[in-house]
């Protein structure tokens, strides 16, 4: 079993992640961190998970008990956390915020769009998950780019929410 921790567990993205992990045969959620909801049941916030879990939010961070840590935090918070906490060297991290999406010499996160970067994503220690608009645009344009069919300006109209 892959032992998972989640930071920023009260948001919409975290709710969907929790739902996916609860139904994953090889994942076990060890903790869901939310300082503002510590002690409350996850289903108090994510009502759609009622009957699926008895987990509660915690303000603790038992990083040494997990294999993978997901960040479902506001933009900027993942970077602050990484700079201010002693994160175990072997801990895999998947960031769902925008903090590490841009390639830089100051971090080792890889851009985690599997359709574009599958090999690197599978072996990476740190993965920066692309945002919804970037994913929409890239998945739509990658097949055209692969066949050299993008010859002019491109306009994308996308809606989220």
Tell where the protein language model's regions lie, with residue ranges:
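N-terminal Rossmann-like NAD(P) cofactor-binding subdomain of oxidoreductases
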Residues: 1-161
């Amino acid at each position: 079993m892959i032992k998972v921790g989640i930071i920023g567990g009260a948001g919409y993205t975290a709710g969907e992640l929790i739902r996916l992990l609860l139904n994953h045969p090889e994942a076990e959620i060890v903790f869901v961190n939310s300082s503002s909801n510590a002690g409350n049941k996850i289903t108090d916030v994510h009502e759609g998970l009622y009957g699926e879990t008895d987990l509660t939010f915690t303000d603790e961070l038992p990083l040494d008990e997990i294999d993978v840590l997901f960040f479902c935090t506001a933009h900027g918070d993942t970077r602050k956390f990484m700079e201010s906490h002693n994160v175990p060297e072997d801990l895999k991290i998947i960031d769902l915020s925008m903090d590490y999406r841009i390639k830089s010499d100051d971090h080792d996160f890889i851009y985690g769009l599997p359709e574009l970067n599958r090999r690197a994503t599978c072996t990476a220690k740190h993965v920066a998950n692309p945002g919804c608009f970037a994913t929409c645009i890239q998945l739509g344009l990658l097949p055209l780019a692969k066949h050299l069919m993008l010859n002019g300006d491109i306009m994308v109209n996308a809606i989220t929410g």
